[in-house]
From Swiss-Prot:
Cellular compartments per GO CC: cell surface; extracellular region; phosphopyruvate hydratase complex
Designated name of the protein: Enolase 2
Keyword Transport: no
Family recorded in the similarity comment: Belongs to the enolase family.
Key words of the record: Cytoplasm, Glycolysis, Lyase, Magnesium, Metal-binding, Secreted
Subcellular compartments: Cytoplasm; Secreted; Cell surface
Classification via PROSITE patterns: ENOLASE
Co-factor requirement: Mg(2+)
HAMAP family to which the protein is assigned, alphabetical: Enolase
Function: Catalyzes the reversible conversion of 2-phosphoglycerate (2-PG) into phosphoenolpyruvate (PEP). It is essential for the degradation of carbohydrates via glycolysis.
Matching InterPro entries: Enolase, Enolase-like_C_sf, Enolase-like_N, Enolase_C, Enolase_CS, Enolase_N
Cofactor binding comment, as recorded: Binds a second Mg(2+) ion via substrate during catalysis.
Length: 429
């Protein structure tokens, strides 16, 4: 049988869960096999992320992606014609070299990533393998999931500055068992919010976005919902939050303007400790300090990283060079991984390997502007990333990721599927 090569690469402009344009890419092999991928987009974006190419101008508020689509249909299509789809690293390197910039500003990370993901899908389809199996082989595990059930910050129009309040299933006999506990808690939380006199409208990621007084009130509602759903906080369901502190970091004063008050970095750290004391079921904090405030980020890790998961997102942006620097500085103990922050499957794999090699955990992540594409679910299982955050158990673009994990568990066999837990499980000893 003749070996398949890439015949055609093409793209189109579609729309994401926020109604914004994004790129959908097709990779078609010489035997007609199709791989298709849809590219997500973030609202809370780190300054060091690869460039998402937008059209500018009046059309669609300047957010069109026809330039990126054209780059796929012309330059990338020409360069990849006849290439080997089973050599992912080579495909990605061709596009990186073709772009020629350090942040993919010429062709657009949204163009390059769409093709990178679609290539992996085409190769898996050609071999008649599930994507997670093609990318990961046989040593696979289902992730610990983190669900953003109260939205604040850039993800909601309310007065809360912390961006994501998450719940995660601790005790679970299967992925389905853990997810059902999350669903029960989510529906209970809706009633807790409404009983307190707030509306229960949804934010970008499917979590509720009530106009609460402050972040402590949000945590209290999570605590109450866990108990009312019939679970023990910290034992069966734990809490995590993403401060996304870059968005309330004052670059002039180097302080933090948070929910009507100004905090020095030390005072902000004390505030987090007060929350931990009141809600000991908090097990993970993401971006407690701004992406430029590496010293305080590292100091907080040194002081509390042995008892708390501390996740770095905006300071490192899935970039292996930045991850290496963060490791050298002792910043965080978990690296958030987002495919579109770096822009290719191969570079994302390199970021995960680098973190793991240095004893860091990893958490895969969706973006606030999502599509129905489930690539991130397969990728999480394939890489044994151990943790995944993909939003609340609501809104189809979020739930579809979890539904895909349910399918994967079924395919692996519920009894034999390995479940990931926190590395060095210090939080639950």
């Amino acid at each position: 049988m003749e070996k398949q090569v890439i015949e055609t690469v093409k793209a189109r402009e579609i729309f994401d869960s926020r109604g914004n344009p994004t790129v959908e890419a097709d990779v078609i092999l010489s035997d007609g096999t199709l791989g298709r991928a849809e590219v997500p987009s973030g609202a809370s974006t780190g300054e060091k992320e690869a460039v998402e190419l937008r059209d500018g101008g009046d059309r669609l508020a300047g957010k069109g992606v026809l330039k990126a689509v054209n780059n796929v249909n012309t330059v990338i299509n020409h360069a990849l014609h006849g290439a080997d789809p089973f050599n992912q690293a080579h495909i990605d390197q061709i596009m990186i070299d073709l772009d020629g910039t350090p942040n993919k500003a010429r062709l657009g990370a949204n163009a390059i990533l769409g093709v990178s993901m679609a290539t992996a899908r085409a190769a898996a389809n050609a071999l008649q393998q599930p994507l997670y199996r093609y990318l990961g082989g046989t040593d696979l595990e289902l992730p610990q999931t983190f669900h953003n059930v109260i939205n604040g910050g850039e993800h909601a129009d309310n007065g809360i500055d912390i961006q994501e309040f998450m719940i995660t299933p601790v005790e679970r006999t299967s992925f389905r068992d853990g997810f059902e506990k999350i669903v029960n808690t989510y529906h209970t939380l809706k009633k807790v919010i409404e009983d307190a006199g707030y509306t229960s409208g949804l934010g970008d990621e499917g979590g509720f976005a009530p106009d609460l007084k402050n972040s402590e009130e949000a945590l209290q509602m999570l605590h109450d919902a866990i108990i009312k759903a019939g679970y023990t906080p910290g034992k069966e369901i734990a809490i995590a939050f993403d401060a996304a502190a870059s968005y309330f970091y004052n670059r002039t004063t180097h302080n933090y303007d948070f929910e009507g008050k100004t905090y020095t970095p030390a005072a902000l750290g004390d505030y987090y400790l007060q929350l931990l004391a009141k809600f000991p079921e908090i097990v993970s904090i993401e971006d407690p300090y701004g992406e430029e405030d590496w010293d305080n980020f590292a100091s907080f890790t040194a002081a509390h990283g042995d008892q708390l998961q501390i996740v770095a997102d905006d300071p490192v942006c899935t970039n292996p060079q930045l991850i290496r620097q963060a490791i050298q500085r002792g910043m965080a103990n978990n690296i958030l991984i987002k495919l579109n922050q770096i822009g290719t499957v191969t570079e994302t794999l390199a970021a995960i390997r680098l973190a793991r090699k240095n004893g860091y955990a990893t958490m895969m992540s969706h973006r606030s502007g999502e599509t129905g594409d489930t690539f991130v679910a397969d990728f999480t299982v394939a890489t044994n990333a151990a943790q995944l955050k993909a939003g609340a158990p609501a809104r189809s673009e979020r739930v579809e990721k979890y539904n895909q994990l349910l399918r994967i568990e079924e395919e692996l066999g519920a009894d034999g599927a390995r479940l990931a837990h926190f590395p060095n499980n210090v939080m639950f000893d």
